Design a protein with these regions (language model features):
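Gly/Ser/Thr-rich active-site cleft segment
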Residues: 1-62, 150-202, 539
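N-terminal glycine/serine-rich phosphate-binding loop of ATP-dependent small-molecule kinases
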Residues: 13, 19-59, 76-80, 97-118, ...
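A generic local structural motif
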Residues: 44-45, 67-69, 107-108, 234-238, ...
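Hydrophobic pocket-lining residues that define ligand/cofactor binding sites across diverse proteins
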Residues: 32, 73, 237
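Short acidic loop-to-helix transition motifs that present clustered carboxylates
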Residues: 1-3, 41-46, 63-65, 89, ...
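Glycine-rich phosphate-binding loop of actin/hexokinase-like ATP-binding domains
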Residues: 53-60, 64-175, 261-301
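C-terminal, non-catalytic interaction/recognition modules in large multi-subunit enzymes and RNPs
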Residues: 78, 88, 141, 145-147, ...
């Protein structure tokens, strides 16, 4: 397979991980005599423990969450699902549209792994993300409080009895604004310390000339956090040519329910689903996953034509035979086994292939050109397409009913309905407090409301309506859009500075990603010798991506020179110097 360095990294990682996994699984099986033990893989499928390898385990947990989202969405008639998994230190986002989107090379902790993985985009934003005021901006993440010291409200103290945590975390912000209730936690929360730290942060803003109340400052932190997570979802949807408004937002993870409405509103998504097991949905996903084997065969670099496609018949059949034999050995009959053929294709001279499922009409060229145009916005007329690799995926379909575990979900009723004050959109709102188990099928709850669960809290914003559906799933519908206009001003503030910094930075980073994936130049696609940046109308630097910094000085001079020579630029114009 092409990619010597990636294969070397993968072999090294596997050599470290697999012996440890084998020892652990051997000990586990000794405690479970007579049991059949299957392991979750990063590709989204199960495999017998004896065949499990370390390099296939890297993202197995998050992949199980994506599988759960897909199965739940299909069960309720939603073939397109965005997975939004917000935990303590990070948020994982994914997209499903009838097929799992897989990548075959990724980088984790600086190590390149060549193995099938469900495409999951991870950002450093979670309930533990630190919220600080620095250099005139409100910052959320990427640093995290972790489990020790954790958020300020957890109240962990050192030997002298002093609070370990010094910085606010997103969880503290939600508590301060009333979106979390202390009585819904299994231990006491230190709300007094959170309030004091929030007031001191607002005072820092005032010393910089920004007259923010503690509540406005807190809401600014959430606005920045939500923007980062919404941008991550755009990376796996809009940036790849998909209209995110057509998708269901499947929200899970311990912190996801507090932010689901805000994320949906920013993206224009109309419906949210929160499963009863949302706090542990990855574990649930393992229970409903299929058994999957994936194999590949390097082809070399054959041009895409009828003759070369015909020559692939034998390697495809060999891979299918190997995969079906393995899946049958795990107890599946042929009626429950499905096979799929795929090809890795790319334009000659480029670096990154596109993996395509075999088209129904067999026209790989048209499928490739269409996909390339959707991803990158153009096609290369006259440049030949080459085949790098053929792949086969063999699936043993599970008979597990995704709803069969739900009957075991129990939670205590809170009795008489309560109300609490929640700060939202610049004002305090009286919100209903309900337990999920208090809601009967078909009953509707209009926001603002807090819906409590044993493993999470759901904040229903004004303009959203919540209701219980089949299998105790909670559906949130966006029923009232806010059509108020945003008032822009030339006066900067700590919130807007960070919001626009993230937006412009994202543009520059996307420019670099597309440039690398589509480039023919070795300097660009392998040495990464380039820089991308955004400039204002007079050529001043606005934002740059973390590329080679040496280019940035000359780049600004070049942009200003082009502006001087071409003063009548119009939208859509492109200049090459």
């Amino acid at each position: 397979e092409i990619g010597f360095t990636g294969r070397g990294d993968t072999a090294t990682a596997d050599a470290y991980l697999t012996p440890l996994l084998i020892d652990y699984l051997r000990e586990l099986k000794q405690h479970l005599p007579g049991s059949s033990l299957k392991m979750m893989q990063s590709s989204g499928g199960l495999i017998e423990a004896e065949k499990f390898r370390g390099h296939n385990s890297i993202l197995s947990g998050p992949a199980a969450g994506v599988v759960a989202c897909a199965r739940i969405g299909e069960r309720f008639g939603f073939p397109k699902v965005i997975g939004f998994d917000m935990g303590g230190t990070s948020t994982d986002v994914s997209r499903y549209d009838g097929q799992f989107e897989r990548v075959y090379e990724s980088q984790t902790a600086g190590v390149r792994i060549k193995a099938p993985m469900i495409h999951i985009h991870t950002i450093a934003a979670g309930g533990g993300s630190l919220c600080r005021f620095h250099a005139g901006r409100l910052l959320s993440g990427p640093e995290s409080a972790g489990s020790d010291p954790g958020p300020i409200c957890y109240g962990l103290v050192d030997k002298e009895g002093n609070l370990k945590a010094r910085d606010l975390a997103v969880t503290d912000i939600n508590l301060f604004l009333g979106r979390l209730l202390p009585e819904n936690f299994p231990f006491d929360l230190n709300k007094v310390a959170v309030k004091a730290r929030m007031q001191s942060t607002a005072e820092q803003c005032r010393m910089e000339g920004q007259d923010f109340t503690p509540e406005e400052t807190a809401e600014g932190f959430l606005q920045i956090t939500n923007l980062k997570m919404a941008q991550a979802i755009k990376e796996v949807s809009v940036a790849q040519g998909h209209d995110v408004r057509d998708y269901l937002l499947c929200c899970f993870g311990g912190a996801g329910g507090q932010h689901a409405c805000a994320i949906a509103r920013q993206l224009g998504i109309k419906k949210i689903l929160i499963h009863p097991f949302a706090g542990v949905l990855s574990a649930y996903g393992m229970g409903v996953a299929d058994t999957v084997w994936e194999g590949s065969c390097p082809i070399g670099q054959l041009h895409l034509n009828e003759e070369n496609l015909d020559s692939l018949k034998t390697p495809f059949e060999d891979l299918e035979r190997e995969g079906v034999t393995l899946i049958e050995s795990e107890g599946f009959t042929r009626d429950w086994i499905e096979t799929q053929r795929k090809l890795d294709l790319r334009y000659v001279g480029t670096e990154t292939p596109i993996t395509l499922l075999e088209p129904e009409d067999g026209d790989y060229e048209k499928a490739f050109v269409d996909q390339h145009h959707q991803l990158y916005g153009y096609i290369r007329e006259g440049r030949p397409i080459e085949i790098l690799q053929c792949r086969v995926e063999v699936t043993g379909k599970t008979e597990t009913d995704p709803g069969q575990f739900i009957a075991s979900v129990q939670s205590e009723r809170i009795g008489q309905e309560r109300r609490t004050s929640v700060y939202f959109s610049g004002d305090n709102h009286e919100a209903r407090v309900l337990n999920r188990s208090d809601l009967s099928a078909g009953e509707k709850v209009t926001g603002p409301a807090l819906i409590l669960e044993s493993i999470g809290t759901v904040w229903v914003e004004p303009g959203f309506e919540a209701g219980i559906g089949e299998d105790q799933n909670l559906f949130l519908d966006w029923i009232s859009e806010d059509h108020s206009e945003t008032n822009y001003t030339t006066e900067s503030d700590p919130i807007s500075l960070e919001v626009f910094n993230n937006l412009f930075m994202s543009i520059a980073e996307q420019m670099g990603t597309i440039l690398r994936l589509t480039s023919v130049s070795t300097n660009i696609k392998e040495r990464l010798d380039f820089s991308c940046a955004v400039f204002d109308r007079v050529g001043r630097l606005v934002a740059n991506a973390p590329h080679i910094p040496v280019h940035l000085g000359a780049m600004g001079e070049t942009v200003r020179a082009v502006i001087d020579q071409c003063p009548k630029m119009k939208p859509g114009d492109v200049y090459v110097s």
